[in-house]
């Protein structure tokens, strides 16, 4: 039972250092393999309209990073796969579970994407299990990511249905208000939920939501994630698709959730909100900084590669990471 586990979130955990075995953090290898491909970082920008469009997806793929294209331009998905494959890049798309998506998946046989993410808010569902089975039947070589879920039972069921990876996180994101609207979710205990789910998993887990600092990437790996999906830290860049808005002479970019009225265009079943983020620099600068910070984390872990973070000790100190830092 869950109640036997300590409940904590990212800000409650500090990892404990080990003796460093590398001369420079630059020696630390941040690459990870998911399916048949290896990527520079165990990080993937959230498949949301204000985080990436086709151009950002292409930039990420060319740079050796994993990406998942969102599913909100349905008609553009097949041309997008062709655009990526024509350049020798991997194609990674999202699908929902509505009836017409079954025909869409069957149409992909001629030019199958390397990755498909089944992307719905409550992924522990018969509809998701049925879609996993359909994709695996039609496109046996495509790597299927299914989510989102928040329990070990869900992870096991989706894996048993054929999912190659599961995405864990129900509403912990900065622009997600599922926990407020419904009373359900992993907000406030996302890291403990990740740990709980990872203990049951036999295949990779993607932690999704609640990442606020680069140190949270290392913590996610410690508690069982193979890949970490990040929204707000990737929003608001020069390349980001969100609208740029000027307020009192300062530039902001809009960032909204995938079930918000801004994305749906209608105020129904809303579980997302819109916020404005101060406009940042280039996306590549953030990716480089994440890589350097993760290299430092690996060196503190006494390791040489990402997997070495899985073995460090940790301490639970409630809400401790901003202690002594009055600016927060």
Swiss-Prot record:
InterPro entries: Aldolase_TIM, GMP_reductase, GuaC_type_2, IMP_DH/GMP_Rdtase_CS, IMP_DH_GMPRt
Reactions this protein catalyses: IMP + NH4(+) + NADP(+) = GMP + NADPH + 2 H(+)
Keywords associated with the record: NADP, Oxidoreductase
GO CC, one annotated term: GMP reductase complex
A GO MF term: GMP reductase activity
Catalytic residue list: 176 (thioimidate intermediate)
Name of the protein described by the UniProt record: GMP reductase
């Amino acid at each position: 039972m869950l109640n036997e586990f300590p409940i904590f979130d990212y800000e409650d955990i500090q990892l404990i250092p080990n003796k460093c075995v590398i001369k420079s953090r630059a020696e630390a290898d941040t690459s990870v393999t998911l399916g048949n491909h290896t990527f520079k970082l165990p990080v993937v920008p959230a498949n949301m309209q204000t985080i990436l469009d086709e151009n950002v997806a292409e930039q990420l793929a060319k740079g050796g990073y994993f990406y998942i294209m969102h599913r909100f331009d349905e008609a553009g998905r097949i041309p997008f796969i062709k655009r990526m494959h024509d350049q020798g890049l991997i194609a990674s798309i999202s699908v929902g579970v509505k009836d017409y998506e079954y025909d869409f998946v069957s149409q992909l046989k001629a030019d199958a994407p390397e990755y498909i993410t089944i992307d719905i808010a409550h992924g522990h569902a018969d509809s998701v299990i049925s879609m996993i089975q359909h994709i695996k039947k039609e496109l046996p070589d495509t790597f299927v990511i299914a989510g989102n879920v928040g329990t070990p039972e869900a992870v096991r069921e989706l894996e048993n249905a054929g999912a190659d990876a599961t995405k864990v996180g129900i509403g912990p994101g900065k622009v997600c208000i599922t926990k407020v609207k419904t009373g359900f979710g992993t907000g406030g205990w996302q890291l403990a939920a990740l740990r709980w789910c990872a203990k049951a998993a036999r295949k990779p887990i993607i932690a999704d939501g609640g990442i606020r600092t680069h140190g949270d990437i290392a913590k996610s790996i410690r508690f069982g994630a193979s890949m970490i999906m990040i929204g707000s830290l990737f929003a608001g860049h020069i390349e980001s698709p969100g609208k740029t808005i000027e307020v009192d002479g300062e530039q902001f970019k809009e960032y909204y959730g995938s079930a918000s009225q801004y994305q749906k265009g209608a105020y129904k079943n809303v579980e997302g909100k819109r916020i404005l983020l101060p406009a940042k620099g280039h996306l590549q600068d953030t990716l480089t900084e994440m890589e350097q910070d993760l290299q430092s984390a690996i060196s503190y872990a006494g390791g040489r590669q990402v997997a070495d973070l899985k073995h460090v000790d940790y301490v639970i100190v409630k809400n401790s990471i901003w202690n002594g830092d009055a600016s927060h």
